[in-house]
Amino acid sequence: MSEIGERVKKIVVEHLGVEPEKVVETASFIDDLGADSLDTVELVMAFEEEFGCEIPDDAAETILTVGDATKFLEKNAKS
């Protein structure tokens, strides 16, 4: 996992309280990690804060897995 991927993983573990080994690229926030819609909004906000970028609503709707978040942030992160 990339450095950004590791940071994404850390945020997911902290916000969802899941075991780190469950946070893999293909893990769905809702189906695999037990997030609800509020959790996903909070994750997006945490990603924005951690990486210094804005995630527009239309982009946020496409971030369904850990891998989706990592790919988006690798392209758009400022820090």
Curated annotation (Swiss-Prot):
It is found in: Cytoplasm. Residues 2-77 form the Carrier domain. Transmembrane segments: none annotated. Gene3D superfamilies: ACP-like (1.10.1200.10). It comes from the Bacteria. One of its GO terms (cellular component) is membrane. GO terms for biological process: lipid A biosynthetic process. 4'-phosphopantetheine is transferred from CoA to a specific serine of apo-ACP by AcpS. This modification is essential for activity because fatty acids are bound in thioester linkage to the sulfhydryl of the prosthetic group. Pfam families: PP-binding. InterPro entries: ACP, ACP-like_sf, PP-bd_ACP, Ppantetheine_attach_site. Pathway: Lipid metabolism; fatty acid biosynthesis. One of its GO terms (molecular function) is acyl carrier activity. The modification O-(pantetheine 4'-phosphoryl)serine is found at S37. Keywords: Cytoplasm, Fatty acid biosynthesis, Fatty acid metabolism, Lipid biosynthesis, Lipid metabolism, Phosphopantetheine, Phosphoprotein. Belongs to the acyl carrier protein (ACP) family. This is Acyl carrier protein. It comes from Afipia carboxidovorans (strain ATCC 49405 / DSM 1227 / KCTC 32145 / OM5) (Oligotropha carboxidovorans). The gene is acpP.
